[in-house]
């Protein structure tokens, strides 16, 4: 019996929410281990649509424990708003089924303001963030000046910690010509949050260690994708945390041995939000067709996603950096009806063929994709629940992806609905 880590194998938006929700039926505990409320999930269950950003997808399953780990950056207001919204849809959420690491870093309004200011300062240097304060909050965490959830339980020492935080931020704001922040305003806001948030606080590493020793099944839910990893992604156009599978251990407070099976998520094509290199992007009618069919708009931001063909080089790289054991391929149905489908099998850089994506920003901008053209299929794959429901050519496409990325397909998703999933290998039983 393996614990399972679910990570994106592209630039995020691969459909992790649905797959995690589908797998969570077999799990006892679902853990978010990095990121913040910048990465949204849309789940369709029995015709009802649920939108999650910060909460683990396990909250939609009764009888499951959901956990927000220490690797997450936590916006108090966004958390309370999301809980309230889901409760209004009939989802039961309380400290009985949701726990938050006491040492999680808090996102404050000053983080959101700084994030937006940086993005607006110059279009030439914009990264394309969601302006939700994720990056600045991680900066304060690394700078050892962050306010953490546990700090709200000690109002005697909280003013000192706020002063330490503002010593940095007010100096920065002076340089930017911004109004100084009064620590009393932050103290007042956090004091009001304390009774609403502290009931969820938990020593998560200890809780998970106890549950692991009891033999409970754990599902670790990543946000974004491996290509947005701050170390292994398309730097600097990345997120501010590690998104690879190894972060599941660090971001939850467990040792690496607690991680068993790594399931990577990828679409049958490729999308990206914001700035950065995208070798297979189709800024043409093909890209628009994929985007319209796939409803490629951000769950949280509504921003249209850039669309292109499947890039086997990048997914193969994610398989290696994440140690992926099996892939869940999503949105195969979006490619129904295409006469031909291109798949990137390699790159050409300065006239030479290469089999990996270079780390240098300049080289990334110069790579040219090498395509293999595959015959499409006319019969629908939407709502298929077994291999027998798939057209032969669609199966050939899936098998070719397996060959190119060097990893088997464990799951296949053919619609946003929870049950429209073809199981090849159960990650919990691998």
From Swiss-Prot:
Identify the residues that bind Mg(2+).
13, 40
User: Which cofactor(s) are needed, names only?
Assistant: Mg(2+)
Q: What ranges does the record list as Basic and acidic residues composition bias?
A: 285-296
Keywords in alphabetical order = Cytoplasm, GTP-binding, Ligase, Magnesium, Metal-binding, Nucleotide-binding, Purine biosynthesis
Q: Which residues form the active site?
A: 13 (proton acceptor), 41 (proton donor)
Compartments annotated for it: namely: Cytoplasm
Can you quote the record's cofactor note? Binds 1 Mg(2+) ion per subunit.
Tell me its family: Belongs to the adenylosuccinate synthetase family.
Give the quaternary structure.
Homodimer.
Protein name according to UniProt: Adenylosuccinate synthetase
For this protein, what reaction is catalysed? IMP + L-aspartate + GTP = N(6)-(1,2-dicarboxyethyl)-AMP + GDP + phosphate + 2 H(+)
Q: What is its EC number?
A: 6.3.4.4
Q: In which pathway does it act?
A: Purine metabolism; AMP biosynthesis via de novo pathway; AMP from IMP: step 1/2
Q: Where does IMP bind?
A: 13-16, 38-41, 130, 144, 224, 239, 303
Q: Name one Pfam family in it.
A: Adenylsucc_synt
Which terms in the GO cellular component ontology are assigned? cytoplasm
Please list where the region (Disordered) is annotated.
Answer: 277-298
Q: What species does this protein belong to?
A: Bradyrhizobium sp. (strain BTAi1 / ATCC BAA-1182)
What's a BP term from Gene Ontology annotated to this protein?
A: 'de novo' AMP biosynthetic process
Q: What lineage, starting at the top, does this entry show?
A: Bacteria, Pseudomonadati, Pseudomonadota, Alphaproteobacteria, Hyphomicrobiales
* Entry-linked InterPro entries: Adenylosuccin_syn_GTP-bd (IPR018220), Adenylosuccin_syn_Lys_AS (IPR033128), Adenylosuccinate_synth_dom1 (IPR042109), Adenylosuccinate_synth_dom2 (IPR042110), Adenylosuccinate_synth_dom3 (IPR042111), Adenylosuccinate_synthetase (IPR001114), P-loop_NTPase (IPR027417)
The protein's role, per its UniProt record: Plays an important role in the de novo pathway of purine nucleotide biosynthesis. Catalyzes the first committed step in the biosynthesis of AMP from IMP.
């Amino acid at each position: 019996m393996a614990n399972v880590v679910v990570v994106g194998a592209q630039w995020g938006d691969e459909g992790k929410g649905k797959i995690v929700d589908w797998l969570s039926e077999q799990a006892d505990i679902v853990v978010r281990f990095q990121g913040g409320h910048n990465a949204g999930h849309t789940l369709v269950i029995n015709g009802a649509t649920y939108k999650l950003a910060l909460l683990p997808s396990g909250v939609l399953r009764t009888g499951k424990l959901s956990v927000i780990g220490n690797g997450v950056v936590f916006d108090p207001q966004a958390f309370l708003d999301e809980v309230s919204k889901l409760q209004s849809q009939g989802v039961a959420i309380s400290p009985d089924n949701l726990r938050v690491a006491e040492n999680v870093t808090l996102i404050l309004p000053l983080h959101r303001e700084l994030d937006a200011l940086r993005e607006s300062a110059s279009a030439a240097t914009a990264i394309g963030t969601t302006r939700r304060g994720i990056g600045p909050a991680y900066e304060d965490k690394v700078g050892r000046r962050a306010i953490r959830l546990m700090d709200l339980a000690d109002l005697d020492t909280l003013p000192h910690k706020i002063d330490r935080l503002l010593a940095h931020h007010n100096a920065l704001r002076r340089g930017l010509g911004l109004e100084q922040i009064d620590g009393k305003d932050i103290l007042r806001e956090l004091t009001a949050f304390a009774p609403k948030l502290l009931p969820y606080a938990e020593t998560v590493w200890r809780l998970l260690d106890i549950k692991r020793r009891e033999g409970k099944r754990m599902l670790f839910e990543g946000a974004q994708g491996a290509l947005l990893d701050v170390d292994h992604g398309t730097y600097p156009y990345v997120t501010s945390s590690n998104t690879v599978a190894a972060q599941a251990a660090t971001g939850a407070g467990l040792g690496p041995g607690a991680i068993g099976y790594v399931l990577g998520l990828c679409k049958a094509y490729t999308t990206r939000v914001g700035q950065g290199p995208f070798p297979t992007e189709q800024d043409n009618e093909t890209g628009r067709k994929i985007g319209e069919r796939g409803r490629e708009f951000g769950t949280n931001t509504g921003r249209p996603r850039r669309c292109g063909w499947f890039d086997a080089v990048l997914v193969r790289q994610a398989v290696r950096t994440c140690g992926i054991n099996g892939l869940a391929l999503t949105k195969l149905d979006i490619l129904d009806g295409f006469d031909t489908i291109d798949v990137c099998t390699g790159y050409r850089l300065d006239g030479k063929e290469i089999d990996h994506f270079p780390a240098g920003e300049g080289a990334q901008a110069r790579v040219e994709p090498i395509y293999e053209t595959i015959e499409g299929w006319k019969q629908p794959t939407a709502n298929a629940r077994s291999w027998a429901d798939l057209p032969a050519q669609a199966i050939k496409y899936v098998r070719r992806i397996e060959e190119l990325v060097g990893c088997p397909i464990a799951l296949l998703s053919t619609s946003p609905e929870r049950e429209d999933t073809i199981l090849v290998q159960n990650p919990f039983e691998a």
